From Swiss-Prot:
Its main location: plastid. The gene is PETE. Participates in electron transfer between P700 and the cytochrome b6-f complex in photosystem I. The keyword Transit peptide applies. PANTHER family: PLASTOCYANIN MAJOR ISOFORM, CHLOROPLASTIC-RELATED. This is Plastocyanin, chloroplastic. The keyword Metal-binding applies. It comes from Hordeum vulgare (Barley). Its cofactor is Cu(2+).
């Protein structure tokens, strides 16, 4: 029986290698890389869809319309229970969002969902998540008399 007492491994060096042209068509290389990009995009989209599937969507509401009109925009909308509603001061007038205690589902504490402090700067926001199904009436305290009132239906 023969025994191996030592072995040598030779690793070639590529430091002095000269570039070789590939015999593959550049069109094939482009197609292959586009295929990889498409596959990566599909994976990213699927991952995004899974993330969105587990989280609630959002509803944005402007406090004041473009042009300075004192309204909620939109002023009548629906959301699913657990979706976030973000109210955004659009023009810089002082606005707030007060839920009317006589116009919300029974048992809802309006002090926990209202923003009674004024949002005074353009871009300031207030977000609320409503979880009890029903209809909620809300208004802007300083501008309710001018018609700045709204309604959200939670399904």
């Amino acid at each position: 029986m023969a025994a191996l007492s030592s072995a040598a491994v030779s690793v070639p060096s590529f430091a002095a290698a000269t570039p070789m042209r590939s015999s593959r068509s550049s069109r094939m290389v482009v197609r292959a890389s586009l295929g990889k990009k498409a596959a990566s995009a599909a994976v990213a989209m699927a991952a995004g869809a899974m993330l969105l599937g587990g989280s609630a969507m959002a509803q944005d509401v402007l406090l004041g319309a473009n042009g300075g009109v004192l309204v909620f925009e939109p002023n009548d909308f629906s959301v699913k229970a657990g979706e976030t509603i973000t109210f955004k001061n659009n023009a810089g007038y002082p606005h707030n969002v007060v839920f009317d205690e006589d116009a919300v589902p029974s048992g809802v504490d309006v002090s926990k969902i209202s923003q009674e402090e004024y949002l005074t700067a353009p871009g300031e926001t207030f977000s609320v998540t409503l979880t009890v199904p029903g209809t909620y009436g809300f208004y802007c305290e300083p501008h309710a008399g001018a018609g700045m009132v709204g309604k959200v239906t939670v399904n």
